[in-house]
Amino acid sequence: MTTSSPWRATVLTLFPEMFPGPLGVSLAGRALASGLWQLEARDIRASATDRHRSVDDTPAGGGPGMVLRADVLAAAIDAAEIGQGSSKERPRLLMSPRGRPLTQARVVELARGPGPLIVCGRFEGIDQRVIDGRGLEEVSIGDYVLSGGEIAALALIDACVRLLPGVMGKEASGTEESFSDGLLEYPQYTRPQLFEGVPIPEILTSGDHAKVAAWRRAEAEALTAARRPDLWAQIPVKAPNRAGRQKTPKNKTDG
């Protein structure tokens, strides 16, 4: 992290009551209660200036729906940044289906910083002038459309918070998961030893850590190749795995 202050997420939304929501329980909730990170949900409508507290208007050029106004949202962003130090250090994100896909690599970057300001869109979108004028980075969590950016913001914050120092019980946990090395995570097993006639793979109970690591790597490669060929194509060829990398492995669980 770049500052001594706790990692802080500021969310601009028309529905601040949606926060902390699921971030108030489990790992994120305990970390929030203990001060390992901070959350501020700010109502965009508080920056409206007319008596009706209007935040949207019809699209220029016509079309369905409504558009979030640039003047209202810009005022909300500016108010949120007051007293937050240098705004250049703090990412400004807009949750949007047209944004760049959120990756684990980007999550790691965000978790190492001071924490982002996140704008949650609604309606047909927001005025492009505030996106450009306030330097908003558009981020997508998938190729689908939600009713607003709040659920996407919750997902992004959760992904970041679990990587913060002291949040997870075992520091290695965050580095041995799907996407941490570009691969999907290997299959996991625990007791009972035998479940419905299916045993835990013998190698996992062998006590040979090198063989266990090799098995997990091979399973991760097989899963990635079968389920996410887009990720598999980006995995660099490495000497210990060269044979498997030259020929796409087939995972028994994927047929």
UniProtKB/Swiss-Prot annotation:
It catalyses: guanosine(37) in tRNA + S-adenosyl-L-methionine = N(1)-methylguanosine(37) in tRNA + S-adenosyl-L-homocysteine + H(+). The keyword Cell membrane does not apply. It is found in: Cytoplasm. Its EC number is 2.1.1.228. InterPro entries: Alpha/beta_knot_MTases, tRNA_m1G_MeTrfase_C_sf, tRNA_m1G_MeTrfase_TrmD, tRNA_m1G_MTases_N, tRNA_MeTrfase_TRMD/TRM10. Residues 236-255 are annotated as: Disordered. Transmembrane segments: none annotated. One of its GO terms (cellular component) is cytosol. One of its GO terms (molecular function) is tRNA (guanine(37)-N1)-methyltransferase activity. Gene3D superfamilies: 3.40.1280.10, tRNA(m1g37)methyltransferase, domain 2 (1.10.1270.20). Belongs to the RNA methyltransferase TrmD family. HAMAP family: TrmD. This is tRNA (guanine-N(1)-)-methyltransferase.
